[in-house]
C-alpha cells in the first residue's frame, strides 16, 4: 500500500526540520507515542534505531524506527517495523518562501500475516491518521 500526503507550514525549512528531528517535540505533535527509547547509532543519523511504544485505537503497539537515510531537506527516509507491518516513509521538505515550507510524506507499507488481509480497508484510516499527524506538527511549529 502506498500513499502520499503534503501540507504547507508557515515556518522556515531549517526550523521545521529542527522541530521534526527533536525527540523532545514528539509529545507536542505525536501524542500517541508513549515512549521513545534510542537503541543504537547516532540519533537522527543513518543506521540509528529507536524503539517506540504507540497508543493505537485498541491497544499499545511497539515498533522500531530505523533511519535509512538523511539528506535534508530533500529526504529523510525512516523505516518503521511492527508485527506484520513495515512502513518506509520518505519525508521531503520543500522551500516555498523564506518562512514557508511544503512537507511531503510518502508512505510505503508492506504487510504480512493477518495484516495482509486487513490492510485493504485500513488505507483510508492510515492516510487520515498520517494527515492528522502532519496537521499537528504544523500547528505546533506555527504556534512557537
Model-derived segments and spans:
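Hydrophobic ligand-binding cavity/cleft-lining segments
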Residues: 1-40, 45
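Hydrophobic pocket/interface hotspot
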Residues: 16-20, 26, 50-52, 67, ...
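Short structured motifs
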Residues: 3, 35-37, 75-76, 88-90
